Amino acid sequence: MSNKGQLLQDPFLNALRKEHVPVSIYLVNGIKLQGNIESFDQYVVLLRNTVTQMVYKHAISTVVPARPVNFHPDAEATTS
């Protein structure tokens, strides 16, 4: 994945992680996972509920926060 794609992903996921916002993650096969984002990198998201699951980003369709989240992508992303 290019850096440009991560200019949006990283601040969004980081805001969800820092604010401990519960999320629903829908996979491409339709399965719904729920929990809190513990950590993430370029390829995976660690989702914590009763256990911690490693979810590969290529399997994720949608991330839905339980409440609105304020996040600010890098200023460079809006000027490029």
Swiss-Prot record:
Biological process per Gene Ontology, one example term: regulation of RNA stability
GO cellular component, one term: cytosol
Alphabetical keyword list: RNA-binding, Stress response
Sm domain residues: 10-69
Domain of life: Bacteria
GO molecular function: RNA binding
Function, as annotated: RNA chaperone that binds small regulatory RNA (sRNAs) and mRNAs to facilitate mRNA translational regulation in response to envelope stress, environmental stress and changes in metabolite concentrations. Also binds with high specificity to tRNAs.
Subunit structure: Homohexamer.
Family under the similarity heading: Belongs to the Hfq family.
Protein name: RNA-binding protein Hfq
